[in-house]
A protein has these predicted regions:
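Bacterial Sec-dependent N-terminal signal peptides
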Residues: 1-25
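Extracellular beta-sheet-rich ligand-binding/adhesion modules
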Residues: 17-158
């Protein structure tokens, strides 16, 4: 009987799985001066658009943002050398801080993009940190897009 318990105790961890993404199926809100750091994938299948704090993407392996709804962040930051793959777009309503790594959008899907809302701005763009793919801006006449390819910043002026 003791041997059976030992065997079960050894096999139990094989059936346990860790959560590999933050899955939003309700309402998440970042309150004024609040901060959330994503170190894993984000699957956003519900409203995530009434935010006033900072949403940061951190880590040392690529993070994916996907889901049925586009998240809208107030302040956004990327500090992930491997980048953030956007499988659904994201919007920034205030500051985007490029520290390290690229926001990457699929080249074959123009409807997935990094969106700067009216009066949004960015800092820190560089060869290793920018948007590698599609970017949009809302209600602005003049804007310099922080875009480029996988190796080099190639800003585009509107």
């Amino acid at each position: 009987m003791k041997n059976v318990l030992y065997i079960l105790a050894l096999l139990l961890p094989l059936g346990i799985q860790a959560q590999t993404a933050l899955y939003n199926s309700g309402n998440i809100r970042i309150h004024n001066e609040g901060q959330i750091g994503f170190h894993t994938d984000l699957i956003n299948n519900a409203s995530f658009d009434q935010n006033l704090g900072l949403a940061g993407f951190y880590g040392s392996s690529m993070i994916s943002v996907s889901g049925a709804f586009m998240p809208v962040f107030f302040d956004t930051e990327i500090a992930n050398d491997q980048g953030v793959m956007l499988n659904t777009g994201i919007s920034a309503s205030s500051n985007t801080n490029f520290v390290a790594g690229n926001f990457v959008t699929p080249r074959q899907q123009q409807d997935i993009y990094f969106n700067f809302l009216q009066d949004a701005f960015y800092v820190g763009e560089s060869d290793p940190s920018k948007v590698d793919g599609y970017v949009t801006i809302n209600n602005e006449q003049n804007f310099i897009f922080p875009v480029g390819d996988s190796e080099q910043l190639r800003s585009l002026t509107l």
